[in-house]
Amino acid sequence: MHILRFSDLCAQGQARGQRVFIRADLNVPQDDAGRITEDTRIRASVPCIQMALEAGAAVMVTSHLGRPTEGEFKPEDSLAPVAQRLSELLGREVPLVADWVDGVQVQPGQVVLLENCRVNKGEKKNDPELAKKMAQLCDIYVNDAFGTAHRAEGTTYGIAEYAKVACAGPLLAAEIDAIQTALAHPKRPLVAIVAGSKVSTKLTILQSLSKNVDGLVVGGGIANTFMLAAGLPIGKSLAEPDLVNEAKAVIAAMAARGAEVPIPTDVVVAKAFAADAPATVKKASEVAEDDLILDIGPETAAQLAAQLKAAGTIVWNGPVGVFEFDQFAGGTKAIAQAIAESSAFSIAGGGDTLAAIAKYGIEKDVGYISTGGGAFLEVLEGKTLPAIEILQKRAAG
């Protein structure tokens, strides 16, 4: 995949004295008082900003925050808390600029944060007039926001059409490289773990991966539907009986390629979904009518761990059990540890997956941790993301 990279432009001295517009993803969670509760995305944006400053550019950074109404600015929509955190991380003041579409004052060696881009009318619909105005603000447009790459908006797509130069920042470039390594040119065997509560939300991902992967591990409520498809009892567990035929089709598609969807041979059940519910390990064929399946059993976990350790590439999206409750966390912990110990290139994404990675402290053992939720899922579906597509078009001239 050919795209221009901001790091290359900087290395060649092409950013010196230039006005650089960086679209970052600074959409961080806040508490009721507006305080930032988790700043990973802000920290992840720093290398691109530092790169631009060190290259001698005049730097403008923007992002969306929350879901403001276009054309109506409210105090809770402000990037002010982000500007404060960014100032701390960069060790310099980062002024916040409102009403910036018609012009921004910034000198080489300076950085300013442009107020919440989703307040601008036409941002979400990718209005060409807005896009042209934003493109006129800069000499180089840099997209460093993988988390919004699946949306064709003014600051992710439109500006890239009209800017003199459009390129990928280091975070976006790293995401693209990791995805290429894992899905376009994987070292085999390629094993994907797709878990979550519903097949319906991840059916297109399962269908897309079933054409490419050597092993497709399902977990959570998704696994219950696959157990139904295999003729196993699931008691009163969460499942989607109306999607059993789709599950059977995924199993058949894998089998036709000599690959498999491993169905659990044992499970961990409880009579209630609760933090203090007693857990019981049962054979998959012996689940009672009043049982809730809340994790895979130790035998299944050991089989999957062996498969992951022998893999060449691993894609992980979703914990395989209710890992928030320790008695139903064994399966997810075993999978996390197997990924950590495997020599495979691994890529992981999705909020719950990141929480599991943090819980078991394996951040340094995962090849690449994706910052994008919805964008990561769309990549797994085999879709080309609009923000990446426009950078490819611009690179091709």
Swiss-Prot record:
Q: What is its EC number?
A: 2.7.2.3
Where is it found, in Gene Ontology cellular component terms? cytosol
Presence of the UniProt keyword Cytoplasm in the record: yes
Any single biological process term in GO = gluconeogenesis
Q: Name one Pfam family in it.
A: PGK
**List of residues binding ATP:** K202, E324, G350, G351, D352, T353
Instruction: Say yes or no: keyword Transmembrane present.
Output: no
Catalytic EC class: transferase
Q: In which pathway does it act?
A: Carbohydrate degradation; glycolysis; pyruvate from D-glyceraldehyde 3-phosphate: step 2/5
Domain of life according to the entry: Bacteria
Gene3D superfamilies, A to Z: Phosphoglycerate kinase, N-terminal domain
GO MF annotation, one = ATP binding
User: Which residues make up the binding site for substrate?
Assistant: D25, L26, N27, R41, H64, L65, G66, R67, R118, R151
Assigned keywords, A-Z: ATP-binding, Cytoplasm, Glycolysis, Kinase, Nucleotide-binding, Transferase
Q: Where in the cell is it found?
A: Cytoplasm
- Catalysis performed (reactions): (2R)-3-phosphoglycerate + ATP = (2R)-3-phospho-glyceroyl phosphate + ADP
Quaternary structure annotation from Swiss-Prot or TrEMBL: Monomer.
Question: Family per UniProt?
Answer: Belongs to the phosphoglycerate kinase family.
Q: What name is this protein filed under?
A: Phosphoglycerate kinase
Origin species, per record, is Acidovorax sp. (strain JS42)
Question: Per UniProt, what is the name of the gene that codes for the protein in this document?
Answer: pgk
